[in-house]
Curated annotation (Swiss-Prot):
InterPro entries: eFR1_2_sf, eRF1_1_Pelota, eRF1_2, eRF1_3, Pelota/DOM34_N, Ribosomal_eL30-like_sf, Transl-rel_pelota
GO-annotated cellular components: cytoplasm; Dom34-Hbs1 complex
Lineage, highest ranks first: Eukaryota, Metazoa, Chordata, Craniata, Vertebrata
Keyword Metal-binding: yes
SMART domains to which the protein is assigned, alphabetical: eRF1_1 (SM01194)
Intracellular or extracellular location(s): Cytoplasm
Keyword Magnesium (UniProt): no
Domain of life: Eukaryota
Name this polypeptide is given: Protein pelota homolog
Pfam families, sorted: eRF1_1 (PF03463), eRF1_2 (PF03464), eRF1_3 (PF03465)
Transmembrane segments: none
Gene symbol of the encoding locus: PELO
Species in which this protein is naturally found: Gallus gallus
Length: 385
């Protein structure tokens, strides 16, 4: 994401102009947008025209509109973002108050205006515009004849290539067809790796499969690299890490990311940091339950006692339609940071973020036990009953 301009007043009202450059930038933009915001962007509008002879036709015209946002739709697979709203600025093709849907496009700037920019939204802009936040983990999830080449970014998992090759079964006395097809499959996966993985940024490439597929593939890849003097692969050989998965489908990537060998190798990446933080929470919940809380009311009371060491919170909560509820989560984040606590904002598109979502989306590891907190909550809930 590229920041073109930022104009904010003292009361944090104002606007920012951004250019989405990567598919993931659409996810960041989705998290920036809220109902009631003002969005100005280039769009296509179907306009009816009347010729001098009186015949009516329609043309698709590119124009720039400013909408008051009413609905936001994000397709996580295609990384497409559509924003519906009413036109709030004069335009020769679109009447004031008319409805329109803008589909934000890569490499086309947009301007987003808010009555108040909170700290969480501003932090997301900083992260989205920081080159260091690009995908630092890649993964090849495979089985015989099927492979997915993925990039694991700080916010989501992107499938960059899917390789499918029909592998005939081995026949007694004749394995040549099977072997040729397998070699063709391996070669296509190698090409996908070279095409889609930026080794200057990526710290680790996971190769995950059932059985011995990953070992056989890696042997083939590096033997060919030696034969062809492929310096790109040979110089980055140490970045490849082989792990087990139950299949070659994309959804099993979570198995690979939770592998202990992987979490230790990826200790300095955000995705691995989220996995470790959630694992630490579960361990604390099991062994010292008075130092592990989840649910907004419990976590807020722990924060009042300045007991929070690490706050775990899902980015999904900051997309809440109710302004007061959203402000409550922002206030919690700001307060924990003021009290020298660590805040980890989890992506709901990551495995760990999904798990946190099952725990209400907010949890905390405490500095010290707060046993009476549970009792107070039980008493207040029984009084309400």
């Amino acid at each position: 994401m590229k920041l073109v301009r930022k104009d904010l007043e003292k009361d944090n009202a104002g606007q920012v102009t951004l250019i989405p450059e990567e598919p993931e930038d659409m996810w960041h933009t989705y998290n920036l947008l809220q109902v009631g915001d003002s969005l100005r962007a280039s769009t296509i509008r179907k306009v009816q025209t009347e010729s001098s002879t009186g015949s009516v036709g329609s043309n698709r015209i590119r124009t720039t509109l400013t909408l008051c946002v009413e609905a936001i739709d994000f397709d996580s697979q295609a990384c497409q973002l559509r924003v519906k709203g009413t036109n709030i600025q004069e335009n020769e093709y679109v009447k004031m108050g008319a409805y329109h849907t803008i589909e934000l496009e890569p490499n086309r700037q947009f301007t987003l205006a808010k009555k108040q920019w909170d700290s969480v939204v501003l932090e997301r802009i900083e992260q989205a515009c920081d080159p260091a936040w690009n995908a630092d983990v890649a993964a090849v999830v495979m089985q015989e004849g099927l492979a997915h080449v993925c990039l694991v970014t700080p916010s989501m998992t992107l499938t960059r290539a899917k390789v499918e090759v029909n592998i005939p079964r081995k026949r007694k006395g004749n394995c040549s067809q099977h072997d040729r097809a397998l070699e063709r499959f391996y070669e296509q996966v190698v090409q996908a790796i070279q095409r889609h993985i930026n080794f200057e940024v990526v710290k680790c490439v996971l190769v995950a499969s059932p059985g011995f597929v990953r070992e056989q593939f890696c042997d083939y890849m590096f033997q060919q690299a030696v034969k062809t003097d492929n310096k790109l692969l040979l110089e980055n050989r140490s970045k490849f890490l082989q792990v087990h998965s139950s299949s070659g489908h994309k959804y099993v990537l979570k198995e690979a990311l939770c592998d202990p060998a992987v979490t230790s190798r990826l200790s300095d990446t955000k995705a691995a940091g989220e996995v470790k933080a959630l694992d630490d929470f579960y361990k604390m919940l099991q062994h010292e339950p008075d130092r592990a809380f989840y649910g907004l009311k419990h976590v807020e009371k722990a924060n009042e006692a300045m007991a929070i060491d690490t706050l775990l919170i899902s980015d999904e909560l900051f997309r809440h339609q109710d302004v007061a509820t959203r402000a409550r989560y922002v206030k919690l984040v700001d307060s924990v940071r003021e009290n020298m606590g660590t805040v980890r904002i989890f992506s709901s598109l990551h495995v760990s973020g999904e798990q946190l979502g099952q725990l209400t989306g907010v949890a905390a590891i405490l500095r010290f036990p707060v046993a009476e907190l549970s009792d107070q909550e039980d008493e207040s809930s029984s009084e309400e009953d």
